[in-house]
């Protein structure tokens, strides 16, 4: 990669530990039909990450201090925003299809006031097999009003994708630094950190552009953060808190009744089975 070239877009890879999926992610970024800048950001430097950095030619930036989701994501975003005006925090478990950057830049060309870009995604298991991602099917329904790009700068339209659950897949998001200044993540949540952030951004100037075409793949597996948050009941606690910011207590209770059923569906997806989920 030509490090002196100016890129409008940067993939800031949030790397942690020694994930076996990290090389697959980096390869998917290398295979983009339109080149972007790629950097690797970590709070857990090790020989494995250094080796992959040398293999792919992507520089590594190290954050000093203990590992933490908010701190790591904010660091990746800040490093990316110093290099490009559009930043994607690439999750090490996931994959980006070859035309992700192409679609992103095309959307930005038509809507320069775009604050957040997102897209449909496929769901894959630990082996990379496409599985029934029931949660993404529900998210598509939540995102219906975002199809109207001409009015996607309205707060009501942006919030429509977030009011009854997070209809936007966090790994699919790219943020426009002009409208989304650092620090991007300003809450202390472990699971709904992205949902709460998107709600804040929906209330601020800027347009949410969603492309209803699979441009990436989200991986579910036993070691994923989502699974850990289900097992320790943190997901339920945090989702209830965010719903209460948007709805009355009775409405929140009804929504949580269905959301708790969704936790079992995530386990089913992880096992390669089918299920219905709302989150």
PLM regions and their residue ranges:
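N-proximal low-complexity "stem/linker" segments adjacent to membrane-targeting elements
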Residues: 1-28
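Conserved nucleotide-sugar donor-binding catalytic segment
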Residues: 144-235
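A conserved acidic beta->alpha catalytic loop
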Residues: 41-50
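Short, acidic, metal-binding catalytic loop of nucleotide-sugar glycosyltransferases
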Residues: 27-36
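Active-site acidic Asp-centered loop
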Residues: 43, 90-92, 118-120
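Conserved donor NDP-sugar-binding/catalytic core segment of glycosyltransferases
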Residues: 101-139
């Amino acid at each position: 990669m030509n490090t002196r070239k100016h890129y409008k877009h940067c993939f800031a890879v949030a790397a942690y530990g020694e994930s076996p999926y990290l090389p697959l992610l980096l390869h998917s970024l290398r295979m983009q039909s339109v080149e972007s800048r790629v950097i690797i950001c970590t709070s857990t430097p090790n020989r494995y990450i250094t080796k992959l950095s040398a293999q792919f030619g992507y520089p590594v930036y190290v954050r000093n201090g203990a590992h933490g989701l908010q701190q790591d994501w904010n660091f990746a975003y800040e490093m990316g925003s110093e290099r490009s005006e559009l930043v994607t925090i690439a999750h090490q478990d996931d994959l980006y299809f070859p035309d992700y950057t192409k679609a992103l830049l095309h959307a930005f060309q038509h809507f320069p006031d775009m604050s957040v870009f997102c897209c449909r995604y496929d769901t894959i298991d630990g082996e990379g097999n496409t599985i029934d991602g029931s949660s993404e099917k529900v998210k598509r329904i939540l995102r219906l009003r975002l199809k109207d790009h001409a009015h996607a700068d309205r707060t009501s339209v942006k919030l429509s994708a977030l009011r009854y659950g997070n209809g936007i897949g966090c790994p699919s998001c790219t943020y426009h630094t002009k409208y989304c200044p650092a620090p991007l993540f300003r809450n202390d949540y472990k699971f709904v950190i992205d949902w709460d952030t998107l709600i804040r951004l929906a209330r601020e100037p800027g347009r949410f552009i969603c492309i209803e075409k699979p441009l990436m793949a989200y991986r579910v597996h036993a070691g994923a953060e989502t699974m850990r948050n289900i097992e320790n009941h943190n997901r339920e606690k945090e989702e209830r808190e965010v719903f209460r910011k948007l709805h009355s207590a009775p409405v929140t209770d009804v929504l949580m009744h269905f959301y708790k059923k969704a936790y079992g569906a995530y386990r089913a997806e992880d096992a390669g089975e089918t299920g219905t989920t709302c989150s």
